[in-house]
Amino acid sequence: MIRLLITLGFMGYTFFAVAQTGAWQQRVNYKMEVDMNVNTNRFTGTQRLDYWNNSPDTLRRVFFHLYFNAFRPGSMMDTRSRRQGTIQVGRGADWDGRVKDRIVNLKPEEYGEQTVRVLKMNGRVQQLKEHETILEVVLDNPILPKSKVVFDLQFEGQVPLQIRRSGRDNPSSKVRYSMSQWYPKICAYDEDGWHPTPYVGREFYGVWGNFDVKINIDKRYILGGTGYLQNPQQIGYGYELPGQTVNRPAGDKLTWHLVAPQVHDFMWAADPEYIHRTLKIRDSIPATKTSPALPALTLHLLYKPTNEKAENWEKILPDAARALPFIEKHFGIYLPVIGTEGGPVLDIGFSNDTRYPKMSEEEHAQQSVEICQRMMTGKVPDYFFAN
């Protein structure tokens, strides 16, 4: 028996080594332009998606997530949420009380919606099959191994009332828009194949790549999001560099241009009453014989003063500044792939208790300072693994 176990152990090591030498993962580049109507809570957009099939497989179909379609009566998320507590899992009931019957009671203007009107691959219109929160694309030509294709999408949607993870008019924080999982997102493909997982409330699996996003929204709204703002001089609201003149274009809307390199997702939040605070952690420091170069680093805080304890958020930035040296000591220096004028940014936008690349959302300001501190120190390290 011992000899058999040793033999199997060596066999397992051999298979593992072989698998590792052939390791691969897909790669994407997203370029999106979105127009948001704050009166109807609807948006339209275009997406150009460069997709690299680095796998050894020929792909005859691709899949996209349409997450907002979960937030309407009769969806899988709605059905599951209304059954919570009735299904036995292990020693207890499967229970998550955050959704319950909130979806089934939504009115049509409160539903979530995500629709891809047209999808082209390399300029040719493709056949689409929508399965609630998953879009299946039947390709007219397969994507060969080690090749690249370009998808062009025209899409539209409606932002649902805040139910979970994403939405509008958060009943707790009062933040107007918390836009996570808001765009048609290509599903992950790995050694196990496609992962077209229907959205019923769990975590999100994505493909690493670059995002270039333009968001056109009412100019009264202040926005924070994944990535680095490319046009701060046209935006202002505290994003402009010291001494820089803000020159906003004419019209009722502003276009926020954000670029995020080497991340697996993109989110943003916006509200006309956001207060924007910044804290410069350091200027760039050149490398020495004993230490690596350090990039310039600024922390950004967006919060909405909705209650008497809103001043707790003002303590977050200095707390984050004190926590960062410990985090960098144990996890490494926070290094973006590229920098922009003003240096890399950590966005901390508070509304929804979620975290995404370069941005985290919370809604704990009504709690004690200690709870805010614990949440902050727990979320900042996420940036080191999400971008």
Predicted regions and their residues:
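Hydrophobic helix-coil surface modules that form long, contiguous segments used
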Residues: I186-G193, G201-N387
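A surface-exposed beta-strand-loop module
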Residues: W52, G92-S172
